[in-house]
């Protein structure tokens, strides 16, 4: 059971029985070894042996203890002093003669202890109960200085499991000697302890040889209230809050070595300022092993463990969070994600809510939770948008398919209309060709029933050209498009005649001509022919006497015959 529950009584009797004014420190260690050597199960079952006083009249070589039931004897090696500093280092060789000097006082129940001469720096293992291995390792896990769980949690756990009290005894939990003072309260949460987790060295009190009584829950609570332990700050390590009740792992049973553990600085002379009258108070840090994260920040007395510096850092973190929120809102506004910073602060969207909570997080656990929520909400919104896009694409595809069907039906309808139109046109063409008559198809003169508006082909009256009469191939062609070989033969007789006339002038064309142009042309044709001069004069005279076209035609036929006879 817990060492704090052992309350020694009859102080005055003890002071009278004390042989000297001051006991050695090794006697206290031997006394604690006798208490710790008892089995945890027997302590929880029968505590009647605690009423009897302790006598150590036998020599230090005997290594027995007798229980009230008369069970077997168990030998226990002595523990070495755990204190750091020059005053607290006591070797095993020194404890032997001091135990012999004090051996005449404790002999009533044949409780014996044995001191073995081990003076090394390694921890000494101890066998509890029936001599089995207690599981004590070489390197204690408590050397790194982690604070243990709360006092009330230990009390409840020890009440439920009395077997663990022996383990705590073997582990070296803090006990208070009768007549001693409680641990000093240096400040709020024990933050100003300045590495006083080391055991303060002091001389032993003369009153520590009293009779042990049966501890009751009320006495245990009184001792626990008096021994208010606080977690200490060892060196430059940060404070670790107490462990959550129910999740605390039971530490291994062990004794620390004589020297200071390797993570703690050696205790200075200021820590051993207790006077000779003040009894030694043995304190041992109860800190969880590495890797155990503690959650609770307040002990049983309700005081906060962390100092005011932590609160200042928290306020500073809140200010940084506010500035980071403003920067994030400004960034989102600049990127065009939101319209204004007010929208970021007042938005009800899950992503914005988790983003604000992540920026306002006070610790990494809350920040991790909010960041996970932000990622999941963003993924959910992205998945929702992807689903919406899929639905939209599906609707577009359906619309395209319907448009294709409509276009196909329209094409078929257009083909039908074209074929009907062509059939109507062919029918109309047949009707117009027959002239609207279906019975008499052999008739030569047909009058069409449908008259199309078309340009009538009128026969153009060809003007008579006298030069055409001599050239059969170039008939009815004007002079301007004739070949050059014929131009040499025709010397433009009209101009030649005018030039030869003495009265020819530009004004002569303005006079009214008594001769028609056709008759004039025919006379020029006769005069330009290769006939003799007499024949030319006879033909010109006969033309002037002609009154009808038939007469002119007959005269010109005669002229042509004469010209042909001459050319042939």
UniProtKB/Swiss-Prot annotation:
Basic and acidic residues bias: start-end ranges: 7-20, 83-101, 150-168
Keywords assigned: Chaperone, Coiled coil, Host cytoplasm, Phosphoprotein, Viral RNA replication
Region (Disordered): 1-22, 40-320
Polar residues composition-biased segments: 50-60, 191-206
InterPro entries given in the database record: Paramyxo_PProtein_C, PProtein_oligomer_dom1, RNA_pol_Pprot-P_XD_paramyxovir
UniProt cross-references to Gene3D superfamilies, sorted A to Z: 1.10.287.340, DNA helicase RuvA subunit, C-terminal domain (1.10.8.10), Viral phosphoprotein oligmorisation site domain (1.10.287.320)
Keyword Nucleotide-binding: no
Localization in the cell: Host cytoplasm
GO molecular function: RNA binding; RNA-directed RNA polymerase activity
Gene Ontology biological process terms, A to Z: DNA-templated transcription; viral genome replication
Keyword Secreted included in the entry's annotation: no
GO CC list: host cell cytoplasm
Residue positions, PTM Phosphoserine: 68, 125, 192, 249, 257, 447, 449
Family stated for the protein in its record: Belongs to the respirovirus P protein family.
Quaternary assembly: Homotetramer. Interacts (via multimerization domain) with polymerase L; this interaction forms the polymerase complex. Interacts (via N-terminus) with N0; this interaction allows P to chaperon N0 before encapsidation and form the N-P complex. Interacts (via C-terminus) with N-RNA template; this interaction positions the polymerase on the template.
Function of the protein: Essential cofactor of the RNA polymerase L that plays a central role in the transcription and replication by forming the polymerase complex with RNA polymerase L and recruiting L to the genomic N-RNA template for RNA synthesis. Also plays a central role in the encapsidation of nascent RNA chains by forming the encapsidation complex with the nucleocapsid protein N (N-P complex). Acts as a chaperone for newly synthesized free N protein, so-called N0, allowing encapsidation of nascent RNA chains during replication.
Domain notes: The N-terminus consists of a long intrinsically disordered tail. The central part contains the coiled-coil multimerization domain (PMD). Forms a four-stranded coiled coil structure. The C-terminus constitutes the alpha-helical domain that binds to the nucleocapsid (N-RNA complex).
Descriptive protein name: Phosphoprotein
